Amino acid sequence: MQEIQKNTKKEQYNLNKLQKRLRRNVGEAIADFNMIEEGDRIMVCLSGGKDSYTMLEILRNLQQSAPINFSLVAVNLDQKQPGFPEHILPAYLEQLGVEYKIVEENTYGIVKEKIPEGKTTCSLCSRLRRGILYRTATELGATKIALGHHRDDILQTLFLNMFYGGKMKGMPPKLMSDDGKHIVIRPLAYCREKDIIRFAEAKAFPIIPCNLCGSQPNLQRQVIADMLRDWDKRYPGRIETMFSAMQNVVPSHLCDTNLFDFKGITHGSEVVDGGDLAFDREEIPLQPAGWQPEEDDTALEALRLDVIEVK
């Protein structure tokens, strides 16, 4: 019995550390990009997946101790996909006491009508969903729209654009919506997916499958995701270093004439960004930038416990 109690205490301690790490990551992202301001009404887009559940939980937790006042309203879009469990999210949100709105729109029927059988439906579905969420944000008086994309999503998008789109473009932590009316934020921008997976398992969130529509997964994104996971296993710290690189861009050492005036460089010009060694190899640190040794997370694997609230 004492051994069981000892293990339980250790598990709760490790889970508490995990929640603290996620909370710290979200807090830093919010501060770095000024995501949330005094009086904001945040529309939290809740899909029923691990990422959006985690985002809502951490934002609720931060709300209790933040130096500014902001409110949350959770929004789920019921797209009338066959087998969608309509009762799960309302029951979960009512239990938490979170304000919410379920938006019912038969986008599934529209997509099935417009897209031939066997073709990827994600592009049209995404456009329809985006428009509905923008409209809903206006109706609710939301000042910010929060999406659950995390650090791994941002890196995957960067490599997708480099490999297939020929551009260095990622997924911004904060942006103006394409209709020019809404500010979109990604509070999980600094969070690792593996931390989110462990947290979701520990909290036993009522996960709703993401493939109810029957659409094929994005194979290109899957290839990139597998590549990054392999790198993370074989070369610890590489993921952290690549994400750090996205925050430390040197336009004068790339090739985009829209970002830097290469033609303007003449004899007598000032040295820019430290210049270039030109003929010498640049010194590279032995340890990856931004990397920290992995904490002992073995006790976090496959746990389904209530996490201690961090105040």
Curated annotation (Swiss-Prot):
Tell me yes or no: is Transit peptide among this UniProt entry's keywords: no
Main location, first listed in the record? cytoplasm
Cofactors named for this entry: Mg(2+); [4Fe-4S] cluster
Motif (PP-loop motif) spans which residues? Answer: 47-52
The protein's matches in Pfam families, at most eight in alphabetical order, are given as: ATP_bind_3 (PF01171)
What's the impact of mutating residue 125 to A? Abolishes formation of s(2)C32
Enzyme Commission designation: 2.8.1.-
Query: Which controlled-vocabulary keywords does the entry list?
Result: 4Fe-4S, ATP-binding, Cytoplasm, Iron, Iron-sulfur, Magnesium, Metal-binding, Nucleotide-binding, RNA-binding, Transferase, tRNA processing, tRNA-binding
Enumerate the GO terms in the molecular function aspect: 4 iron, 4 sulfur cluster binding; ATP binding; magnesium ion binding; sulfurtransferase activity; tRNA binding
Task: From the Swiss-Prot or TrEMBL record, state where the protein is found.
Answer: Cytoplasm
Q: What class of enzyme is it?
A: transferase
Assembly state and interactors? Homodimer.
Q: Which family does it belong to?
A: Belongs to the TtcA family.
Q: What else is known?
A: The thiolation reaction likely consists of two steps: a first activation step by ATP to form an adenylated intermediate of the target base of tRNA, and a second nucleophilic substitution step of the sulfur (S) atom supplied by the hydrosulfide attached to the Fe-S cluster.
Spell out the protein name for this chain: tRNA-cytidine(32) 2-sulfurtransferase
Which species is the source of this protein?
Salmonella typhimurium (strain LT2 / SGSC1412 / ATCC 700720)
Q: What is the lineage of its organism?
A: Bacteria, Pseudomonadati, Pseudomonadota, Gammaproteobacteria, Enterobacterales
